[in-house]
Amino acid sequence: MERAIQGNDAREQANSERWDGGSGSSTSPFQLPDESPSWTEWRLHNDETNSNQDNPLGFKESWGFGKVVFKRYLRYERTETSLHRVLGSWTGDSVNYAASRFFGVNQIGCTYSIRFRGVSVTISGGSRTLQHLCEMAIRSKQELLQLTPVEVESNVSRGCPEGVETFEEESE
């Protein structure tokens, strides 16, 4: 069950919640361990006057299968190397394996969610559409993380995200 987090509760939750830490679980879809910031790191990187601000050290993502939810906080430095690393935090195979542990005869709901710098994306579907859900989740994750302004110098030129068209104004 999810609860709304308001005001100072966000900091308290970040300190107490470890986001299902560890990568050794045989049922977790994640292949990287939890990288939640310590209380000291959280305080150093967040504005005390705006406790609803996301921690800029990384992002949160989760996979839910029925009532079971697996969560991770991953560090992301907004570099190509870091992007490549976090895109490998789960694969279609690891998600399928984890989900299969909770499937019975009936279809269950499956949900992927990611939150980065104040933007949340959630994708839901039934267990029979899990492959399509994984494909949409990886595209959403790539677009969300790549659309972030690059805060380090980089020679990499970023084009328009897939599905976005640019138009030039015609001069009269």
UniProtKB/Swiss-Prot annotation:
Q: Does the keyword Coiled coil apply?
A: no
User: Which cellular component terms (GO) are annotated to the entry?
Assistant: virion component
Its domain of life reads: Viruses
Which stretches are transmembrane? Answer: none
Q: Which Pfam families match?
A: Tombus_P19 (PF03220)
Q: Which UniProt keywords apply?
A: Host-virus interaction, Inhibition of host innate immune response by virus, RNA-binding, Suppressor of RNA silencing, Viral immunoevasion
One example of the protein's molecular function in GO is:
RNA binding
Its Gene Ontology biological processes?
symbiont-mediated suppression of host innate immune response
**Which residue intervals make up region (Disordered)?**
1-38
Q: Where is the composition biased (Basic and acidic residues)?
A: 1-20
The family classification in the record reads: Belongs to the tombusvirus protein p19 family.
**What's its job?**
Viral suppressor of RNA silencing which binds specifically to silencing RNAs (siRNAs). Acts as a molecular caliper to specifically select siRNAs based on the length of the duplex region of the RNA.
Quaternary context: Homodimer.
> What name does UniProt use for this protein?
RNA silencing suppressor p19
The organism named in the record is Tomato bushy stunt virus (strain type) (TBSV)
User: Taxonomy-wise, where does this protein's organism fall, top ranks first?
Assistant: Viruses, Riboviria, Orthornavirae, Kitrinoviricota, Tolucaviricetes
